[in-house]
Amino acid sequence: MEKAVHLSTKNGPKVPGEPTKTGTSMVDTAASAVQSFAPINQIHQHLCAFHFYAYDMTRQVEAHHFCGHINEDMRQCLIYDGPDANARLIGLEYIVTEKLFMTLPDDEKKLWHTHEWEVKGGFLFMPGVPEAIQRQDLEKVAKTYGKVYHFWQVDLGHQLPIGLPNIMMAVTRDGQLYPEMIKETEKQFGVSIDKERESRAYMKGPDHGIHPLANGGGKGLKLELREVDIKPVESVPRVFV
């Protein structure tokens, strides 16, 4: 199967539509002056990592996470295909501590992936942040689990978000990512995956080890759509029509 890789916004498909008009920008500016964006204002960090489709490891995407803590045990991230202002919102990820992960039903656990090798392998980093500062948080991230969905298949050149959401996974060992993808990201952000790895060798993963049901339980996962009967509101005899 031919590999599909998406590295950054600059390499992505052009979104169809007219340029934003002055009138629209003026309305946006006026609204932003009086409205609160409290949820977005909770975003406190930018993490760059790589995801692959849970049913097709040959399809790999550079994923930029903009995250905020809900509490000490959970954070939530908006995922874009680049760090630029025109980046596309392609997905979201929930990150929980091992403590919360262990409370999940077994059928749910397979939807979550580990972050241990992402962190220890040097594949997850905070662009522009000194490594010494990064390590203070990445020590915690290495022990966590994440659940991530992508809604926009930019690696296939889709100009709009088409199709079903896709469950994504993260790297768990060497040899899974394309070398050219790693090199391009290193060049773009001025980082060295090998040096990052050396400085994080002391870090530990989940205290109880990687759960055997995590990471898809070692199997591929793919969402499928099927038609079902819709339960209507009692006062409405028909649904939609």
Swiss-Prot record:
Pfam families xref list: DUF1264
Region described as Disordered: 1-24
Known tissue expression: Expressed in seeds. Not detected in stems or mature leaves.
Keywords per UniProt: Lipid droplet
Gene name, Swiss-Prot/TrEMBL: OBAP1A
Main location: other
Protein name per its UniProtKB record: Oil body-associated protein 1A
GO cellular component, one term: lipid droplet
Biological processes, Gene Ontology terms: embryo development ending in seed dormancy; lipid storage; response to abscisic acid; seed oilbody biogenesis
Observed effect of gene inactivation: Irregularly expanded oil-containing structures, 40% reduction of triacylglycerols (TAG) content in seeds and 98% decreased seed germination rate.
Annotated source species: Arabidopsis thaliana
InterPro entries referenced in this protein's UniProt entry, alphabetically: OBAP-like
UniProt superkingdom: Eukaryota
Places the protein is found: Lipid droplet
Coiled coil: none
Family label: Belongs to the OBAP family.
Keyword Chaperone: no
TM stretches of this protein: none
